[in-house]
């Protein structure tokens, strides 16, 4: 059968959706799977064994009613899909199912305006759901017997060879541990204080003097944050500030060399997890870590304000005050136990 899977979200959400794609291929090995997503994150999914075709939408297309609906119409008129899975089910995505009434399975979310578009509607996100369990629920109308909760990404051997040369040119010894530290975040409300990041970085170095620390950051504000943490660490020689992943695809390649990831919870952590790498993250206040961090055979843990302060007491307090209560001493205690338990 031919499957059209629509996932217009950010990087982390799209990476998590690979559990659904993998499950399709495991249950229907002859499946022809097309993945629809935002153009800017498309390189991350090239060559994925559970994806046969990728269709991208630019920001311009997604934010223009006529361009958006016109392209959705062309997609389902060009090819007939037996199964359409709309993981967002918004006004901006439901055109795929609306323009393809002959598709046997039109699966979407249960919303007030989706009743006449999808012939199989799945409950919206509920308390107790995880991102992975909710994604896999969208396959239940198909009667699949095996649902694979694992997320995955792929890179080529050539990409790894080229990036290995780059790392060595930057002074990295591939025989020694590489610790990737996500020192910043795109959104301020997801960024743990930089001085706390410096504290943990210094503790990681003290624990494993042979470890090589690489910072993950984007250009602009995040790069400035990385430089500030580097300053706070006294320009420690264990930190290789010049090593960069210049794209999401390069970050995926870098992940294959990483021994351990520490940082703010977000898309970078999902990439590490998809490559089977252990991770520990600080979760921003107000987010439930059990929702976003998979519980599978890949070691992963977190520190959350909910462990220190009841959620109802957090209401109304500014983010900087909430983050200040997630002390570096508390986080390091949990990180050290995690490292001990996983032989890191």
Model-derived regions: residue spans:
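Histidine-anchored nucleotide/phosphate-binding helix
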Residues: 14-27, 198-202
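Nucleotide-sugar donor-binding patch of glycosyltransferase catalytic domains
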Residues: 109-113, 270-344
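Nucleotide-sugar donor-binding and catalytic loop/hinge architecture
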Residues: 1-2, 160-179
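Conserved nucleotide-diphosphate donor binding/catalytic pocket of glycan-assembly enzymes
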Residues: 55-154, 173-174, 178-187, 286-290, ...
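A short, glycine/small-residue-rich beta-strand->loop->alpha-helix junction that serves as a flexible
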Residues: 6-17, 41-44, 86, 186-193, ...
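Conserved nucleotide-sugar phosphate-binding/catalytic loop shared by glycosyltransferases and other
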Residues: 32-65, 237, 300-308
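Short internal beta-strands
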Residues: 33-38, 107-108, 213-218
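Donor-binding and catalytic core of enzymes assembling or modifying cell-surface/extracellular glycoconjugates
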Residues: 194-285
């Amino acid at each position: 059968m031919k499957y059209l899977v629509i996932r217009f979200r950010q990087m982390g959400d799209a990476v998590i959706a690979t559990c659904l794609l993998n499950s399709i291929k495991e249950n229907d090995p002859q499946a022809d799977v097309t993945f629809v997503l935002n153009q800017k994150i498309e390189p991350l999914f090239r060559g994925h064994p559970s994806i046969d075709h990728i269709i991208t939408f630019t920001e311009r297309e997604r934010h223009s009613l006529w361009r958006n609906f016109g392209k959705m119409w062309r997609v389902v008129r060009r090819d007939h899909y037996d199964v359409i899975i709309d993981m967002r089910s918004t006004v901006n995505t439901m055109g795929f199912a609306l323009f393809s009434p002959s598709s046997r399975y039109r699966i979407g979310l249960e919303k007030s305006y989706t009743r006449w578009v999808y012939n199989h509607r799945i409950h919206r996100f509920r308390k107790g759901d995880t991102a992975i369990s909710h994604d896999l629920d969208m396959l239940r109308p198909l009667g699949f017997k095996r649902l694979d909760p694992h997320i995955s990404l792929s890179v080529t051997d050539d990409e790894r060879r080229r990036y290995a040369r780059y790392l060595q040119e930057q002074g990295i010894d591939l025989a020694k541990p590489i610790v990737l530290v996500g020192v910043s975040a795109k959104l301020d409300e997801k960024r743990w204080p930089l001085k706390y990041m410096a504290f943990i970085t210094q503790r990681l170095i003290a624990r494993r003097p042979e470890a090589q620390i690489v910072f993950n950051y984007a250009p602009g504000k995040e790069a400035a944050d990385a430089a500030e943490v580097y300053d706070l660490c006294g320009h420690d020689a264990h930190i290789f500030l010049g090593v960069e992943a210049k794209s999401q695809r390069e970050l995926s390649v870098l992940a294959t060399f990483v021994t351990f990831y520490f940082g703010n919870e977000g898309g970078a952590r999902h990439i590490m997890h998809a490559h089977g790498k252990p991770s520990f993250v600080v979760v921003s206040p107000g987010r439930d870590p059990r929702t976003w961090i998979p519980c599978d055979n890949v070691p992963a843990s977190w520190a959350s304000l909910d462990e220190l302060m009841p959620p109802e007491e957090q209401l109304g307090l500014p983010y900087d005050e909430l983050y200040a209560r997630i002390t570096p001493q508390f986080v390091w205690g949990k990180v050290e136990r995690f490292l001990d338990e996983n032989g890191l």
